[in-house]
A protein has these predicted regions:
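FIC/Doc superfamily catalytic core
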Residues: 1-177
Length: 177
């Protein structure tokens, strides 16, 4: 029996809401593989220290929070010039693995911006912020071709439009080819 709000109840009204647990070994492997793979797309490579900690997490020896604490301590004790951006790769990898391990998500521009903030806080000053200036960038994945990005003044509206279009698009019947 439970007393809830001054009312005597026979069952727990929150019993069906379970606290999310860490994922199983297979899913942890997927999350880490994805996290490290996404870093490779930007030409970044994580440290062996992170890879070892990720394996310990996959094996169930340590939690994601413990991986983060170990990593934070590692970089506090061993500051680097970081010309190869290994620290960034390590910190963003653990953050990606953590986000992929959460079962909370909403397909909205705010969630998108929140993910950017979670990934890049402490790495970039603009983490979780919509830029207020126009940019271009040469992309190595496009053999150095320059990409012109959307106008800064319209980014919020463009983002909302793109999300709305994507929500209403049907992938039913499309092949993987």
């Amino acid at each position: 029996f439970i007393i809830f709000g001054g009312v005597f109840m026979q069952t727990d009204p929150f019993k069906e809401y379970l606290k999310q647990q860490e994922p199983d070994k297979k899913y942890k492997g997927y999350a880490w593989q994805t996290a490290i793979g996404l870093q490779a797309v930007d030409g970044l490579k994580p440290s062996e220290y992170l890879v070892d900690a990720a394996i310990q997490n996959i094996e169930g020896k340590i939690t994601l929070d413990e991986v983060k604490k170990l990593l934070d301590s590692y970089y506090e004790e061993k500051p680097q010039k970081n010309h190869d951006r290994t620290e960034e790769a390590d910190k963003v990898s653990i953050r990606i693995a953590k986000i992929l391990s959460e079962h909370a998500f909403s397909f909205t521009p705010n969630e998108y911006i929140s993910i950017h903030r979670k990934l890049f806080t402490g790495i970039y000053d603009h983490a979780g912020k919509i830029r207020d200036y126009n940019i271009t960038k040469k992309e190595w994945v496009l053999n150095g071709a320059t990409v012109i990005y959307g106008s800064a003044s319209e980014l919020r509206k463009t983002l909302e439009y793109d999300f709305m279009k994507e929500k209403h698009y049907s992938y039913k019947g499309l092949s993987m080819d």
